[in-house]
């Protein structure tokens, strides 16, 4: 016996699932006489045909004639319940995960849309004869191997060295104590097998219940189905069920029949739930055939096809063996109806719970889809309204553009008529433009002359301004001189007042001196008279007594002589006073004459300054008036020049335009 590798298939959800499902249902009656699990490995057949044959084999495993009525009714209810939800699931636009079972642990996985037939992973299905360590080793090795499955050697048990690790080695069953079991199935095993189970039964029980530990009940049903298929088909390939002991084979077949019925119930339920689950689960059960079947199919797929008739004969023999096994399984199923009913009821409860969950999820998805559709409808209505508004606006714009087009056409026609009418007028205007151009040239010449005059006037204005500045400077200098003269005149008046005061004082002194002089004259006269008398009295004694008598003069003579000396001194003093008075008078007269001269000069200078100031003021007023007149003339000239330049610019542009017109006409 030789082992064969399983084909790993990546299955995604696609819209073609419903079509493929219906196609398998239509083709299933035609291929009832063939073995689906073996024929699916033959090259030259499509994946769709392989799936159809897998579904036929799963349908054959059941016993519809001997099944109780309760199973049929419950199965019909499940089918109708799940089929009623097909429209809901198929109508949703979202991506739906379809449930299928893995060949190792029975977990749910997502199904891919495109069926890629390439070999992504070299995976080996778990058989009851394989050990846990061998499985782990084979998984680690097969995870890194890619490509087509290795070729098998026709001799049983002899494999090539390079392929030895990638294939499942046929080994004997090892008794393994199961850890956790489903209560109903454990009851079946203990009741039928008892404590003395064979190696194949214990390994089947381990595979049947080992994967159910630590995962939901929903996954247990799928794992039971796959394990049942792999256990029954692979066991019959190596040794038929009839070769095992009766008690042990009965127990193992009972377990297989239970797992087969549960697998088909779950298969029917999930096939109605989603179009992909039936095909995926059937595709998963394909690798669980017998070793002999897999060896023949691997030969057919790995090597070129030798002869189709030989393969068909082999397949018919295998099919007969399977029918015998199925007959025995049906007999065992009749014996274990009560246990199967209990298991089926539990399965039905789980299915109802799943159905309720699916209904709730479906209602939620339908609600979300309805809300989404409502939002999309509102958005579309809003877009339609906006498009209608834009359409109305575009229609209005189009009508306005048509009206504008008509108006423009009318205006173009009127312009053409005016052009035909204005042709002769244009000629006249051209001649007038020529005349105006001559006038403009004259005006330009006049403008140049006026500009020259303006430049001359501006030079004169500059000269007048410079003269005005000089006159202003002279006026300031003369004003400063007048101010100085006024200051000097003021000082002179003060000096004259001082001199007048001094003169008055001198006059007063002179009056006092005159009075003194008159008094002194009187005293001198009295003294003269006394002196004359004394002289007359003393002459008589002069000759008689010359010197010696002088010594003996009397006091009266001494007094007289002293009075005479004093009188002489007074006379001299009076003479001196008279001389001083005369000098003072002469000096006073000279000062008065000098003051009069200065006064006359100051008056003359004052009159000159006044006349000069009056003349400067008159000149300043005249200059101011002239400046005002010049500024007025300059403003008028600037205004005239600006107007002429503007007119010249307009006429120059018009002249160029009309000259271009005449040139183009010529």
UniProtKB/Swiss-Prot annotation:
Q: Which InterPro entries match?
A: LZTS (IPR045329), LZTS2 (IPR028597)
Which GO CC terms are listed, alphabetically? centrosome; cytoplasm; microtubule; midbody
Q: Does the keyword Hydrolase apply?
A: no
Is Transmembrane helix tagged as a keyword?
no
Q: Where is this region: Disordered?
A: 1-35, 227-249, 266-307
Where is the protein found, in the record's own terms?
A: Cytoplasm; Cytoplasm, Cytoskeleton, Microtubule organizing center, Centrosome
Query: What task does this protein carry out?
Result: Negative regulator of katanin-mediated microtubule severing and release from the centrosome. Required for central spindle formation and the completion of cytokinesis. Negative regulator of the Wnt signaling pathway. Represses beta-catenin-mediated transcriptional activation by promoting the nuclear exclusion of beta-catenin.
Q: What name does this protein carry?
A: Leucine zipper putative tumor suppressor 2 homolog
Taxonomically, what lineage is the organism?
Eukaryota, Metazoa, Chordata, Craniata, Vertebrata
Q: Which gene encodes it?
A: lzts2
């Amino acid at each position: 016996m030789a082992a064969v590798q399983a084909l790993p298939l990546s299955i995604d959800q696609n819209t073609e699932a419903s079509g493929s499902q219906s196609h398998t249902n239509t083709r299933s009656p035609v291929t009832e006489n063939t073995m689906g699990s073996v024929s699916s490995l033959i090259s030259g057949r499509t994946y769709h045909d392989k799936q159809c044959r897998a579904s036929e084999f799963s349908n054959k495993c059941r016993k519809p004639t001997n099944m109780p009525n309760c199973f049929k009714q419950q199965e019909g209810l499940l089918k109708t319940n799940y089929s009623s939800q097909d429209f809901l699931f198929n109508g949703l636009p979202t991506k739906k995960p379809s449930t299928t079972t893995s060949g190792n642990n029975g977990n749910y996985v997502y199904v891919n849309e495109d069926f890629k037939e390439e070999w992504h992973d070299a995976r080996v299905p778990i058989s009851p004869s394989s050990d846990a360590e061998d499985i782990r080793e084979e998984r680690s090795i097969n995870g890194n191997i890619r490509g087509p499955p290795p070729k098998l050697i026709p001799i049983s048990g002899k494999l090539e060295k390079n392929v030895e690790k990638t294939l499942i080695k046929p080994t004997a069953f090892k008794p393994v104590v199961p850890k956790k079991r489903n209560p109903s199935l454990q009851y079946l095993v203990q009741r039928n097998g008892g404590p003395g189970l064979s190696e194949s039964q214990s390994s089947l029980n381990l595979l049947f219940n080992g994967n159910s530990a630590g995962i939901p009940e929903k996954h247990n049903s799928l794992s039971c189905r796959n394990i049942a298929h792999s256990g029954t088909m692979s066991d019959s390939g190596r040794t038929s069920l009839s070769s095992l002991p009766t008690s042990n084979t009965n127990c193992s077949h009972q377990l297989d029949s239970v797992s087969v019925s549960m697998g088909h119930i779950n298969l029917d339920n999930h096939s109605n739930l989603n179009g992909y689950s039936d095909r995926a689960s059937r595709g998963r059960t394909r690798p669980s055939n017998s070793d002999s079947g897999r060896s023949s199919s691997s030969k057919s797929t790995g090597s070129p096809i030798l002869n189709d008739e030989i393969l068909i004969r082999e397949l018919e023999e295998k099919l007969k063996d399977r029918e015998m096994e199925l007959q025995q399984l049906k007999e065992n199923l009749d014996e274990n109806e009560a246990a199967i009913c209990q298991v089926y009821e539990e399965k039905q409860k789980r299915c109802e719970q799943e159905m309720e969950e699916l209904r709730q999820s479906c209602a939620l998805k339908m609600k979300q889809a309805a809300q989404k559709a409502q939002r999309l409808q509102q958005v579309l209505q809003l877009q339609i309204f906006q498009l209608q508004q834009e359409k109305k606006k575009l229609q209005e714009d189009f009508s306005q553009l048509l009206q504008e087009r008509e108006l423009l056409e009318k205006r173009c026609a009127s312009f053409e008529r005016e052009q035909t009418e204005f042709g002769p007028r244009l000629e006249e205007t051209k001649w007038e433009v020529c005349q105006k151009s001559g006038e403009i040239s004259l005006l330009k010449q006049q403008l140049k002359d006026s500009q020259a005059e303006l430049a001359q006037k501006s030079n004169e204005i500059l000269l007048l301004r410079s003269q005005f500045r000089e006159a202003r400077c002279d006026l300031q200098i003369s004003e400063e001189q007048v101010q100085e003269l006024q200051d000097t005149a003021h000082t002179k008046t003060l000096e004259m007042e001082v001199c007048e005061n001094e003169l008055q004082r001198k006059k007063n002194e002179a009056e006092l001196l005159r009075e003194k002089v008159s008094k002194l004259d009187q005293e001198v006269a009295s003294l003269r008279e006394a002196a004359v008398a004394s002289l007359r009295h003393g002459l008589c004694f002069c000759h008689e007594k010359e010197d010696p008598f002088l010594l003996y003069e009397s006091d009266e003579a001494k007094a007289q002589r002293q009075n005479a000396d004093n009188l002489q001194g007074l006379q001299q003093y009076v003479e001196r006073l008279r001389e001083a008075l005369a000098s003072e008078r002469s000096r006073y007269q000279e000062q008065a004459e000098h003051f009069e001269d200065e006064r006359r000069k100051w008056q003359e200078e004052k009159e000159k300054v006044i006349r000069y100031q009056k003349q400067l003021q008159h000149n300043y007023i005249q200059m101011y008036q002239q400046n005002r007149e010049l500024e007025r003339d300059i403003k008028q000239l600037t205004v005239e020049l600006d107007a002429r330049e503007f007119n010249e610019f307009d006429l120059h542009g018009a002249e160029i335009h009309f000259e271009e017109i005449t040139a183009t006409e010529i």
